Amino acid sequence: MDVIKVEGGHEITGEVTVEGAKNSALKLMAATIMAPGVTTLKNVPNIADVHVMGKVLKRLGATIDVLDKHTLVIDTSNVDKWETPYELVAQMRASTAVLGPLISRFGKAVVAMPGGCNIGARKIDMHILGLEELGVQFDVKHGNIHATTPNGITGNTVTLAFASVGATENLMMASVHAKGTTIIDNAAREPEIVDLANMLNEMGAKVRGAGSPVIEIEGVGELHPVTHTVVGDRIEAGTFLAIGGLCGKPVTVNGFDPIHLGLVLKKFEKMGLVVQREAHGCTVWREGPILPTDIQTLPFPGFPTDMQAQTMCLLALAKGSCVITENVFENRFMFASELQRMGADITIEGHHAIVHGVPGFSGTQVKSPDLRGGAALVMAGLVADGVTTVSAIHHIERGYEGFVSKLVSLGAKAERDTVPDDEDAIRD
C-alpha cells in the first residue's frame, strides 16, 4: 500500500511552479478528436488522470507521442471508434468529456457512465438535456450512454439549470459543427472554459463569450490541428498558497494567473494572511493568527469547491468559529472526519460544516477520501505534532504532479512510501 508520511514542525518556505491545469488538459485532449491530424499540447501535467485520458484516446484510434514530460503530440487522424471502455471511464469522471467531441465528429457516441472521486452524484443529466436541445437522441442502458443524431446537430438556445462546467464544455464541443448558432445561457465561467474556447478558436471554431454567462457558438466546417499551451493550474496554486498561510512563512507560487484565484485570495486576506500578487504568480504568508471566516462554495467566480478542503484545514486552526457551506457537491465533507482524527473540531450539518478552531493537530494515520481532501490531509500533517501517514494516495496522484517532491523543496520532511496492507487494516 502506498502512503505519504509527513513529519510536522519543519519550516516551510520557498518557491514552486505549478503545472498545467488538470481540469483544462483533460478537455483539451478530448477536443483533439474534432480536429483530425496532429495537435501538440504543452504544459500538460504528468498525472494519473492525464494517463487515463490518453488511454481513452488510444482506444478510440489516436496515437500519442510524449515529446517531454509535459508535451503531448496527439494524432487523431485514424480515430475510427466512438465507444469508450468502462474500465477506463470508471477511473475518471472527466472521461465524459469525449461525448461532445465524438458526437461532433461521428454524429454518435457510446460512453460509459463516469467514475472518479466519490464526492457526489455528479449527475450528467444537464449534459444529456442540453445536447437533446441540439437534436441529439439518447438511450441510457447497461451503464452506457448511447448518443445518436439522426437529423444532425442543429444550433439552439440551451439554458443550463446550473452553471455546470462539464455540461458547458460538452455543449461547446458538440455544437462546433452544428447547423446554425448555439447559445449556452447560464454557462460555466471557469478559466478552464476560456482555455478550451481559445483552443477551439485556434482550430477554426467560432466561439464567443467564454468566461461570461452567455456563450455563442457559430457552427463551422472542419477544424484543423494546432499547438496549444495549457493554462496554469489555479487549484494546485491555491493548495500551495494555503500551505504558506498555514505554516506561516512565505510560499511563492509561479506559473498561474492570480486573477483565476480572485475570491480565494480575498478570503485568505480576511483570514489574516498576507497576499502578494504578481503578474504570473503569488506569495502568501502569515504574521498573526488565522482568523475565522465563513466560506461558501459556488461556481466561478465564486469560491471553488476544489479549494474547500484546503481552506477547512486552515480554518480548523483559526482563533474562533466559522461556517463552511458546500453548494456544489453533496458529499464533499468526507475529509472532515479524517481531520477530526488529527484533533480538529468540526460538526457537519447537511451541507454546512461548523468549524471551531483548535490550537493544533496531532499526527496519526488518516485515509484520503478524494483528491483535494487527500492533499489537505498532507497539508495538515505539515503542522501536526508528530508523524502523519496518509493512505489511499492514488486520489492525490490523480491531480497533483510531484506533490511530495515540491513539499520537500519547500523544507518539508515528507516521503512517499510503501507499507504492508495489513498495517492499515483497521482503517479499511
What is each model feature region?
Residues 1-428:
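Structural preference for solvent-exposed beta-strand-turn elements
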